């Protein structure tokens, strides 16, 4: 809650806070639009819910709108994707999927469904 108050204070009156994060279905690896498999991100969803709860409970911001869309991030190799995923909190790469990613012909894409929400600061 402290962080939300600081953000609120930093915004100009009526300023906008943008929040973008993945939403279900699970994130997956793809090659040429073909799925290699889904990541285990159940723990990540728990983190998202816990993180969003204070924003939804506060009277500092009013939700103005949201849009959902597909987000693709391209990697030059499967190894590069797997290395990047090591820093992702709450995401686990199943062993069989990691093998498929390593063997995949590059480029390898990370596919996510995301939501972008716009909140207006209340005064």
Language-model regions: role of each:
Residues 35-52, 67-75, 89-92:
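Acceptor-substrate binding/catalytic loop of class I
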């Amino acid at each position: 809650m402290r962080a939300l108050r600081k953000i609120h204070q930093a915004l100009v009156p009526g300023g906008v806070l943008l929040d973008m994060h993945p939403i279900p279905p699970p994130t997956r690896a793809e090659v040429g639009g073909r799925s290699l498999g889904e990541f285990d991100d159940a723990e990540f969803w728990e983190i998202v819910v816990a993180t969003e709860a204070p924003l939804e409970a506060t009277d500092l911001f009013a939700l103005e709108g949201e849009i959902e869309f597909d987000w693709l991030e391209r990697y030059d190799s499967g190894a590069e994707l797997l290395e990047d995923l090591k820093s992702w909190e709450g995401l686990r790469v199943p062993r069989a999927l990691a093998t498929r990613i390593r063997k995949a012909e590059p480029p390898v894409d990370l596919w996510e469904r995301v939501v972008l929400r716009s909140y207006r600061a209340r005064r």
